[in-house]
Amino acid sequence: MTDKFIELTLDGYKQTAGGEFGGLVPGWFTDEPQVVVTDRHAIRWTPDLFDAFRARWGYDLTPHLVSLWEEVGPWRQVRHNYRDVLMNLFLDRFMKVCHAYCERNELAFTGHFWEHGWPDMAHNPDNMAMYAWQQMPGIDLLYNKFDLDSPNAHFGNVRSVKEVNSAANQTGRVRKLSESYGGAGWDVTLRDLKRLGDWEYALGVNFMNQHIAPLSIAGARKYDYPPTFTPHSPWWEYYRELNMHFARLSLALSSGGQYNDVLVLEPTTSIWMYYTQHAPRRNHWRTMGAQFQEFITALERQQVEFDLGSENIILNHGSVRGDRFIVGKRAYGTVVLPAQMENVDAATFALLRRFAAKGGRIICYGAPRYVDGVPSAEAESFFADAAQVTRADASEPVDAALYASSEIAFDLAQGNCLFHHRRRMDDGQVLFLVIYFAVSYTHLRAHETDQY
């Protein structure tokens, strides 16, 4: 089906504008591809689902279908395995096909998914796994509201931006796109646009795709998630000044590389085990998502420099080199398992054991006891062994001292909301700071810095 879609769309464009591919036509933008079903209480099915499931996991899904709704039988295992199959079918039959077409035609595959739904798995089993197959991974950030708390927020959603930034770091992608400002309203100001844009750039975005620029706002068009980036907006004649700011920022934050020493594993495969739309059981995975969101937001607000880790990306790009945990183009000295990490996939577990044996540092806030959704005494024993892992208390506030860096440190007053982005180049570093709420003082300690 994807091949036919490409034939009817991109090949048609290629006939008329193929000479501009890779130049005037730099890429292909996709908007919210997903595997959601129309009935929220149904499950996604495809004609060869049961064959694909058996080939992947070695048993028949049919007698276990009830486990996708009810907590009967090996329901954690079945739900985990089912979401894993959906993810791989989506990757193999859509993402990899689109990626390959763009590679052949010098295009950047970009756009975004339904990344704000996490931890709801109905639309997409793993956001980061999708980003690994885009030449320019992307997200969207809508509205004019800043919300640090909700896993489903847009601006303020640390997880959403860290996912795309981390996947890009690990796969060697330089540019990260954000479809920004849709639905911010006709009354949005240039100050709002700068405030929101600066925040997402501090988290890793460096290619802004403004929503939207229609030729006309006649009729229903004026209600299509305004504002418009056209002369219809009252600040249009001044908009160039703001664009110059983001152009300079895009260049600076695309130069060199961001090399974070801490990898925080995202508990996506753990949430697979509990995912159901059967109320009230869905409250459990929603709570897991909210707690993880709170944890990584606390890390970011304490200026901990970290990437997020997808177990699918680790499967395809993970290794251990000395005391470094390798994920593609990045090497980490510390791996963090959040309290919500009840499951680790077999490949992840094997790498973590090798990492610990080589002297790598593992910080564990929880007690993973499942591997691929199956209870594992071996995993439970490993993660409880103080000689293998550093235990941390999830009930206590995040202790930034666990993640202290010898390269940079911040001394901040209570109540701070400072975000930063640091990039290294051959001849120095770039540090971008964004402060969101008032602080009584801010003091930065770094080595051999120039301030501009």
Language-model segments: residues:
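Catalytic and substrate-binding clefts that recognize carbohydrates or anionic sugar/phosphate headgroups
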Residues: 1-19
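N-terminal low-complexity segments that are often proline-rich with Ser/Thr-Pro
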Residues: 450-452
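Carbohydrate-binding surfaces of carbohydrate-active enzymes
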Residues: 15-27, 32-448
